[in-house]
Amino acid sequence: MQREHLAIAVILTLATGCDNVAWEGLELRLKPPTFSSAVSSGQSVITPDLADEEQSLGIPKRPILLSGKRTGSTAKLTAVGEVNGNSLTVISDQGLRSEATGDFSLGLITQSSEWVLFSEGVRIGRMIAQEVSIDDSFCTLRPTISGIVELVSEASDVEQLIALLIDVAGSRSFQPYTAYRHNYNQRVASLALASEVIPSVGAEWPPSILDSRTDIHAFQLPGEPRQAIAATFLHQDRMITLPPEPGAYSLFVMGDATSGTYEISYMWYRLAESQGKGVPRYLDHIDWNGDGSEEILLEMFGSEDLWFAGLARQDSRWIRSFEDSCNSATREK
């Protein structure tokens, strides 16, 4: 069944492939200019003189995962890393800047590149990169793209987005999209989970468990009978890039209700004094490597920078499969 797309704004650039867009009965067929088969398929065309330079720049060869937010009709998406199984590999600064010229070479992240958009683990639209830049607010320099988004109508209110290149994710089908909102029982369950973990890790009790909860999400993983929850609790700290107060810690908990009541499925306790500030916030889930198992993407807030972390399932339990950290204490672990 053909899906009806909602064009959030006028499309200003042509897609790299042929596509149809319809408004009020008017059908526009967008066709690309004629290129060689290598270019039209999205493959890199490398002359012999440039082959060695590309290799020396460390241009990414694996699929790249992007994450970002939509504001109105446009979105800004930042590179998280290269997909490496259920983990991710950071794109190094050396892979972005040419030592010879000082210019940035972004490899697969180029103007006019087409990206498949995801939210809540399902495909919801696309975006064509109109601008490419570098974001220096993270631990390492990160390629960033911006452009106009096209979303399915039921996802018209989505703000948080994850993206993969059309060449990687173009074959993934559209699935029904549902936005999940946490309810009273789930909020109470998150407090119970935190209350269970705090004494087990020897953490100081906050003055109020309720007030220490700074973030909570409900989400539905494929194949699970009930929604899962993820929540972040903070003591003597805030979910921004700012140095913490003495005695600060963060506690991230996830719970599932497969048995009828919520139980801990993953927890991450981090004492800022010994490990450095690293406050996790749930962003979204997606099967980024297409193996049929979902991964979870987290945004991390440090004292001065942002970074990402990822969770994956291993032997039916969640593990931290990736962390790109600014903090030297975490790098050495």
Where are these regions (language model features)?
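Solvent-exposed N-terminal domain segments of exported/luminal and surface proteins
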Residues: R70-S190
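Acidic/hydrophobic-patterned starts of short beta strands in beta-sheet-rich repeat architectures
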Residues: P222-L234, G290-M300
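Bacterial signal peptide processing site
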Residues: D19-V21
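Beta-propeller blade termini
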Residues: R213-Q227, P280-W288
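Surface-exposed loop/turn elements that mediate protein-protein interactions on large endomembrane-trafficking
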Residues: V253-E273, A312-R320
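Repeat-based blade/solenoid architectures
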Residues: P199-I216, R270-Y282, N327-K333
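Bacterial N-terminal signal peptides
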Residues: A7-A15
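Structural motif
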Residues: M239-V253, E304-G310
